[in-house]
């Protein structure tokens, strides 16, 4: 069993994206659902659905433009051994605004841009570009 469920989610998406797969299945949790929702809102994935009764899984439908991947890269920033926290004014921009930072705040999980606008700092979970 993996100890870092967010890293596992990002790795599954990265591997499926590299193989140009249409969908990827991920064990479900509230945090993963929020991250999937952010990826959908920002246009990195087409859609996601939750399936199953007892053991719920998230099925993410990856997005491609012809033969080009929409997700160029995913990087886990805060790790179990080294947590990375940033105040609102120090949340990094990803590729000068072309990517997103996913931040866990006291108000929930949101993009770096939303956190800066709300003036809320938090734990920088990942970068997606």
From Swiss-Prot:
GO terms for cellular component: ribonucleoprotein complex; ribosome. One of its GO terms (molecular function) is structural constituent of ribosome. Keywords: Ribonucleoprotein, Ribosomal protein, RNA-binding, rRNA-binding. PROSITE patterns: RIBOSOMAL_S8. It holds the Pfam family Ribosomal_S8. InterPro entries: Ribosomal_uS8 (IPR000630), Ribosomal_uS8_CS (IPR047863), Ribosomal_uS8_sf (IPR035987). One of its GO terms (biological process) is translation. NCBIfam families: PRK00136.1 (NF001109). PANTHER family: 40S RIBOSOMAL PROTEIN S15A (PTHR11758). One of the primary rRNA binding proteins, it binds directly to 16S rRNA central domain where it helps coordinate assembly of the platform of the 30S subunit. Belongs to the universal ribosomal protein uS8 family. Part of the 30S ribosomal subunit. Contacts proteins S5 and S12. This is Small ribosomal subunit protein uS8. The lineage of its organism: Bacteria, Bacillati, Mycoplasmatota, Mollicutes, Entomoplasmatales. The gene is rpsH.
